[in-house]
Amino acid sequence: MTTLNLGYLATFRLVIQRGSFSAAADVLGLSQPAVSLQIRQLEQFLQTRLVERTGRGIKATAAGETLLAHGERIQQVVDDAIRAVNAFSHDVSGTITLGTGATACIHLLLPLLEQLRRDYPLLSVGVTTGNTLDIVRAIEENRLDMGLVTLPVSGRALDVMPVMDEEFVFIASREQQDAFRELTPEALHAQPLIAFETGSGTRALIDGWFAAHGVAMAPVMQLGSIEAIKRMVRAGLGYSIVPRMAVEQDADREGLCVMSLTPMLQRQLAVVMRQDKILSKGIAALIRLVQHPSGG
């Protein structure tokens, strides 16, 4: 390797984020030896150790921490360069098919699609909502071009590009907020919970948050719509745990108190595509907007 491999740099950042080679390999759809080889080659190129094992997994060395900081800036420069070059092209057109969850569709994707329509009026984006498993299957079968889904994902020959961490927050009606002194699993499990329906990735994540502290959930309601959940909470029928993006805007959080949980609960969203998918100008434009929504 005669130049710094940006792909290996991205793998290194993911290894540190996930805390192990195996976890990074699962996200990337690679074998653990393949991930380890990329890190070794990166270390050989830089002639220094970048990672070390601890009792809690993999962590960056001092040199690795420095590389992480530079890596974020390198990625930003690369993204800026791509955006600048593409500014000379005015023929972004065609149709993209995208799958995502209902919450991300409404609260994250909608403003991005509006911006995409302004910037590239000849580009059409068709959106399908569903759960992560169904979206990944559709991508593998080439029925969708790409997905914006929750990690982890498992699939054959997929490119996985983490784009953002999404926090989950506690919500209750403003009239009832004084009844909730602590927002821990132990304190909340006895309170009436209005939950997402069983079988969704969101429900599994919340179940896991309680289970990690030895607490079993006993929801008083299980609903499939986040808007229905918020209506029930506003009516004072219980509390819920929802993605922060669903209550980010003033109109979305009207009548609700919104607070972070202890410990914090979050998940990671990623853009997923087939590795053999041709990266059209339209797909590239949409990926850039998802990665940097404020800079589009």
Where are these regions (language model features)?
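Flexible hinge/capping segments at coil-to-helix
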Residues: 155-193
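A short LG(V/I)-centered, amphipathic sequence patch enriched
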Residues: 43-65
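Secondary-structure junction motif
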Residues: 178, 192-213, 279-287
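A late-sequence structural motif
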Residues: 108, 257-296
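Hydrophobic hinge/microswitch elements
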Residues: 131-136, 140-144, 149-150, 201-257
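Central regulatory/effector-binding core of bacterial HTH transcription factors
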Residues: 93-156
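Short helix-boundary/capping micro-motifs
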Residues: 13-31
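Beta-alpha-beta core module
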Residues: 155-162, 166, 180, 227-275
